[in-house]
C-alpha cells in the first residue's frame, strides 16, 4: 500500500542507575518513502563508552547491528549492508544511516549504551 516506509526508534537502557538521564534517540520515529536516506542519532548515557545498535522487525526479537567502544567500531553484523553505515565520532553520540531505503528496512531501530 503506497511507497511509504516506516522506521521506528525506541529507547533501550543498559546499566542505567537512578541519576542517569538515559539514552536519547532522535528522531523517535520516522516515516519516509522508498529510496530516501534516513539518519538516526543516539546520545548514550553520560560516561558510557560502549554503544550498540539493534533493529527489530515486526514479530521478531531484536537483531544486533553494530557495537562501538569509544569511537572504534569493534563488531558489525552481516545485516549491515552497503546501504547502512554507523559511526561514533570522538566516542560521543552515534549515527546510523540508511541510504536508499527499501521496504525491508521497515523496523524499530534501537540503541543502547553500557560501561
Curated annotation (Swiss-Prot):
Gene3D superfamilies, A to Z: Immunoglobulins
Domain of life: Eukaryota
Disulfide-bonded cysteines: 42-111
Residues carrying sugar: 37
Keywords: Adaptive immunity, Cell membrane, Disulfide bond, Glycoprotein, Immunity, Immunoglobulin domain, Membrane, Receptor, Signal, T cell receptor
GO biological process assignments: adaptive immune response; cell surface receptor signaling pathway; immune response
Intracellular or extracellular location(s): Cell membrane
Signal peptide span: 1-21
GO MF term set: MHC protein binding; peptide antigen binding
Gene Ontology CC terms: plasma membrane; T cell receptor complex
Occurrences of domain Ig-like (ranges): 22-115
Xref: Pfam families: V-set (PF07686)
Chief localization: membrane
Subunit structure: Alpha-beta TR is a heterodimer composed of an alpha and beta chain; disulfide-linked. The alpha-beta TR is associated with the transmembrane signaling CD3 coreceptor proteins to form the TR-CD3 (TcR or TCR). The assembly of alpha-beta TR heterodimers with CD3 occurs in the endoplasmic reticulum where a single alpha-beta TR heterodimer associates with one CD3D-CD3E heterodimer, one CD3G-CD3E heterodimer and one CD247 homodimer forming a stable octameric structure. CD3D-CD3E and CD3G-CD3E heterodimers preferentially associate with TR alpha and TR beta chains, respectively.
Function: V region of the variable domain of T cell receptor (TR) beta chain that participates in the antigen recognition. Alpha-beta T cell receptors are antigen specific receptors which are essential to the immune response and are present on the cell surface of T lymphocytes. Recognize peptide-major histocompatibility (MH) (pMH) complexes that are displayed by antigen presenting cells (APC), a prerequisite for efficient T cell adaptive immunity against pathogens.
Protein name, as recorded: T cell receptor beta variable 7-9
Amino acid at each position: 500500500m503506497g511507497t511509504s516506509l516506516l522506521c521506528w526508534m525506541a529507547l533501550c537502557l543498559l546499566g542505567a542507575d537512578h541519576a542517569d538521564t538515559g539514552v536519547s534517540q532522535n528522531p523517535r520515529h520516522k516515516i519516509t518513502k522508498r529510496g530516501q536516506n534516513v539518519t538516526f542519532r543516539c546520545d548514550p548515557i553520560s560516561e558510557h563508552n560502549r554503544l550498540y545498535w539493534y533493529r527489530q522487525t515486526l514479530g521478531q526479537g531484536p537483531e544486533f547491528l553494530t557495537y562501538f567502544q569509544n569511537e572504534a567500531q569493534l563488531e558489525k553484523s552481516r545485516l549491515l549492508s552497503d546501504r547502512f553505515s554507523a559511526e561514533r565520532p570522538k566516542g560521543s553520540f552515534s549515527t546510523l544511516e540508511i541510504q536508499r531505503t527499501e521496504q525491508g528496512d521497515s523496523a524499530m531501530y534501537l540503541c543502547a549504551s553500557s560501561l
